[in-house]
Design a protein with these regions (language model features):
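Histidine-centered catalytic micro-motifs used for acid/base chemistry in nuclease
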Residues: 45-57, 66-71
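Short cysteine-rich loop/turn motifs with clustered Cys
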Residues: 2-47, 70
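A binding-site-centric feature that preferentially detects glycan-recognition modules on secreted/surface proteins
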Residues: 92
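Substrate-binding/catalytic groove segments of enzymes
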Residues: 17-19, 56, 77-80
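Glycine-centered flexibility sites
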Residues: 31, 51, 58-59, 78
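Short N-terminal micro-motifs specific to bacterial/archaeal maturation
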Residues: 1, 57-60
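Extracellular/periplasmic catalytic domains that process cell-envelope and extracellular macromolecules
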Residues: 41-42, 60-62
Length: 92
């Protein structure tokens, strides 16, 4: 579960969009437009807090390890990491 503090820290790191209110709209690392009020939604501007280095691999909740990421992208990223871990050499 992500705290409000973590959510706000991740949001503050996302790129500002010129001409748009930074408290309402930002861009993630992939250039997707996010809407603050769409947090936790799987919608066109929905987003989640992503741990850049997953906690399962030793990542922390530090601000440096958090980012706002479009929901679809974050869930795809998680699926890719699970697939890689199932196929890694250490699991053979």
């Amino acid at each position: 579960m992500v705290s409000n503090s973590q959510k706000d820290r991740a949001w503050s790191k996302a790129k500002r969009i010129p001409g748009k209110s930074p408290s309402k709209y930002r861009k993630d690392a992939y250039g997707n437009t996010l809407c603050y009020s769409s947090y936790g939604k799987n919608s066109p501007m929905g987003w989640e807090v992503d741990h850049i280095k997953p906690k399962s691999r030793g990542g922390s909740d530090s601000t440096m390890n958090l980012q706002a990421l479009k929901t679809r992208v974050n869930r795809s990223k998680g699926a890719d990491q699970r697939k890689r871990s199932r196929h890694s050499k250490s699991n053979r």
